[in-house]
């Protein structure tokens, strides 16, 4: 995905001299040296491929970039320190501070008092830093959850974009059939075989079909714009959008609800955040609240994994049915083609069979994408994003 005007700080000066009038409109989160030249080339080639979406979200999504900047500001304000288990460390430092204050109050000489005062303040500062570090860890988890949620949303949007394209093809084929139906109705009316009302009905059906196409094209463009903006392009940009990869049927066979539920519980962002809140609670009442939240999270995760698996199976059945329907409509079209060549059916009957075949083919492609999306949704649940 190339952005000639998206580059890291290291390349900015040279780019200005080479591309006057093309200011950088967005910078990647990662410094230029953080990826290889080949990786940057892939992300900046003005081509959107499905496998690039997570990296594009990380580097160029506005929300993710803003969150990264906020985290950097937090680190600059507080300084980032690696910590022990948060609640244990805070407790240790506070106990040490209390002991130091007691020693200060009971000191028999000035030197001991001074040392105790320094120790008390140092431990209080360390406890405060631990609280800040706990806040940072929670903030980092929240930001990562947001980032992955946007990536999931972008993947689904790309899938929808192609589903709509197939649906548009089906509508356009149907529009052609409806146009032929109008011509047929007019011809039959001139022969006294159809009424004026029949012609009007055919014309109305054609108008409705054309309106559906206009609405579908608008929906496709809205989806396209939303997709590319999520990934750092502007609405008016026209990157090439490559097809979504083929469904890996082996993934379905490899799914194990019990094992995957354990993985999902370990990875779930909401559960991790609630667990942190439980660990850091300073009252029994709060601990009880978050204990219930943690248990509820685990139950919801188990339900989500099972539901996700069932939706994969349903999508697979839907795809299999669509494949069979294509076979049926192909046979029907072959038969209609022979009959049409022999003159035993009308052109409109032949076009109806042809239209049914195209609709079946497009429906199969849509069902294929629905299956792909069901598998991806399941995978996201296992990776901690519900």
Language-model features, listed with the residues they occupy:
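Charged, solvent-exposed structural "stalk/scaffold" segments
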Residues: 67, 74, 128, 166-215, ...
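Sec-dependent N-terminal signal peptides of Gram-positive bacterial secreted proteins and lipoproteins
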Residues: 1-27
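Coiled-coil heptad-register positions
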Residues: 75, 82, 89, 96, ...
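Acidic, low-complexity, intrinsically disordered peripheral segments
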Residues: 30-50, 242, 294, 301, ...
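Short flexible linkers and secondary-structure junctions
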Residues: 28-156
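Short, solvent-exposed, mixed-charge loop/turn linkers that connect secondary-structure elements
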Residues: 217-259, 375-386
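Amphipathic alpha-helical coiled-coil scaffold segments and their short linker/junction regions
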Residues: 47-50, 54-64, 108-134, 234-295, ...
């Amino acid at each position: 995905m190339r952005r000639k005007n998206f580059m890291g700080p290291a390349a900015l000066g040279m780019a200005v001299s080479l591309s006057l009038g093309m200011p950088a409109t967005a910078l990647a989160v990662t410094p230029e040296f953080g990826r290889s030249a080949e990786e940057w080339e892939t992300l900046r080639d003005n081509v959107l491929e499905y496998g690039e979406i997570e990296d594009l979200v990380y580097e160029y999504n506005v929300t993710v970039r803003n969150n990264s900047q906020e985290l950097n500001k937090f680190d600059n304000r507080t300084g980032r320190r690696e910590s022990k288990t948060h609640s244990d460390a805070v407790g240790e430092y506070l106990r040490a501070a209390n002991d130091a204050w007691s020693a200060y109050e009971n000191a028999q000489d000035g030197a001991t008092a001074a040392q105790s005062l320094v120790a008390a303040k140092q431990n209080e500062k360390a406890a405060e830093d631990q609280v800040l570090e706990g806040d940072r860890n929670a903030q980092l988890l929240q930001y990562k959850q947001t980032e992955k949620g946007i990536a999931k949303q972008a993947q689904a949007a790309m899938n929808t974009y192609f589903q709509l394209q197939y649906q548009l093809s089906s509508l356009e084929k149907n529009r052609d059939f409806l146009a032929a139906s109008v011509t047929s109705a007019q011809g039959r009316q001139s022969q006294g075989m159809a009424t004026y009302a029949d012609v009007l009905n055919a014309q109305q059906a054609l108008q409705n079909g054309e309106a559906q196409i206009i609405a579908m094209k608008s929906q496709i463009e809205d989806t396209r714009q939303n997709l590319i903006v999520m990934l750092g392009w502007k609405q008016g940009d026209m990157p090439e959008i490559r097809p979504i990869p083929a469904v890996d049927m082996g993934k379905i066979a490899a799914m194990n609800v019990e094992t995957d539920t354990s993985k999902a519980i370990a990875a779930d962002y909401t559960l991790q955040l609630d667990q942190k809140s439980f660990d850091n609670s300073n009252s029994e009442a709060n601990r009880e609240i978050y204990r219930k939240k943690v248990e509820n999270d685990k139950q919801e995760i188990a339900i989500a994994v099972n539901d996700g698996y069932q939706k994969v199976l349903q999508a697979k059945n839907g795809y299999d049915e669509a494949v069979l329907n294509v076979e049926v409509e192909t046979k029907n079209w072959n038969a209609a083609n022979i009959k049409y060549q022999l003159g035993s059916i009308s052109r409109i009957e032949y076009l109806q069979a042809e239209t049914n075949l195209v609709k079946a083919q497009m429906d199969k492609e849509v069902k294929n994408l629905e299956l792909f999306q069901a598998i991806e949704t399941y995978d996201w649940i296992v990776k901690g994003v519900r």
